[in-house]
Amino acid sequence: MIELVCEDEPEVVCLQELPVWGTSRLAEWSAMKAFPVVARPPRMPGRVGVRVTRMNQGFFRSAFVGQANAVLVSRSLVAEDRGYLRISDPGRERRVVQAVGVAGRYVIANLHANHGAEVAQLETERSRTFAETASRPGEAIVLAGDFNLLDLRLDGYSAASAGVVDHVLVSGVSVSTPVVWPRERRELDGVVLSDHAPVDVTIG
């Protein structure tokens, strides 16, 4: 899926729900600069966790291999890690938002919120505060990821995608209407590569 998303050479890609073992290969798979952050450490090391998870992917999912987020940036652009923040409360599945500065013009904040409207809204607000704190004067703010919210509005930010929980919200610069990938665009040999449809926008 990563190779498919990156084949038309986007400048920035935000990823969520990655297996932790895969973070070391992101730069190879994408041919981009990779900025990963672990949201939940694996319970089993390396390939052992992968093997167990493959026994029943739908049931085990990330329970054994852990979970990570990542921002990918074109190798032609200057980029810097601005850190990350846990956005989930104790007792809930560990979720984080990360920030990456790009080209001195943008701060990209990548998040994955928990399920439940009230919880997801709270984690979104925490992500927004983190992104705005991580930004520098003159930088536009991009808040992207899996918000787990269908009905999402943030004052001062662009409109969310319709009918999906993955969004790209932008403040401080013009942005195109979000384009949600149709099912056939994320299929390979009849297999749907992700249960989440990528969302494309053009900024600036």
Which residues are covered by each model-predicted region?
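Short, glycine/charged-enriched secondary-structure capping and boundary segments
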Residues: 1, 27-30, 49-50, 123-124, ...
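Short, surface-exposed linear patches
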Residues: 5-12, 35-38, 92-95, 129-133, ...
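Metal-dependent phosphoester-hydrolase catalytic domains
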Residues: 21, 77-88, 128, 132-142, ...
